[in-house]
Curated annotation (Swiss-Prot):
Effect seen on changing S29P: In NDOABA; likely pathogenic; decreased function in lysosome localization to peripheral cytoplasm; contrary to the wild type, the mutant does not fully rescue defects in lysosomal distribution in BORCS8-deficient cells
UniProt source species: Homo sapiens
Compartments reported by the entry: Lysosome membrane
GO process terms (BP): heart development; lysosome localization; organelle transport along microtubule; regulation of endosome size; regulation of lysosome size
Record protein name field: BLOC-1-related complex subunit 8
Keyword hit for Membrane: yes
Length: 119
């Protein structure tokens, strides 16, 4: 009869021991220690990723600014085509006046071709 009683007492002791080990293993301070270890191992990599992302963001912002500036410049060129046409007309008019003045200075009318030079 003592053996079943001894087994019961042994089972109670092992159950209490198991419960104590479980409580100790899951105690908040142990959990916080494990969390601290995880953070200590992971933090440098996360900090590097953050720095990389910030650098990429700066590069992207610079590229976006460059593209927007280029688009603005192209739009301004398109908008200024009226002025280019006006300048072109004025240049043609100036060339025509110059030719007329050169022809008048040589005694020829602009419609007559100049005499061939004997060179």
């Amino acid at each position: 009869m003592e053996e079943p009683e001894m087994q019961l007492k042994g089972k109670k002791v092992t159950d209490k021991f198991t419960e104590s080990v479980y409580v100790l293993a899951n105690e908040p301070s142990v959990a916080l220690y494990r969390l601290q270890e995880h953070v200590r191992r992971s933090l440098p990599e996360l900090a590097q990723h953050k720095a990389d992302m910030q650098r990429w963001e700066e590069q992207s912002q610079g590229a976006i600014y460059t593209v927007e500036y280029a688009c603005s410049a192209v739009k301004n060129l398109v908008d200024s085509s009226v002025y280019f046409r006006s300048v072109e007309g004025l240049l043609k008019q100036a060339i025509s006046i110059r030719d007329h003045m050169n022809a008048s200075a040589q005694g020829h009318s602009p419609e007559e071709p100049p005499p061939p030079s004997s060179a």
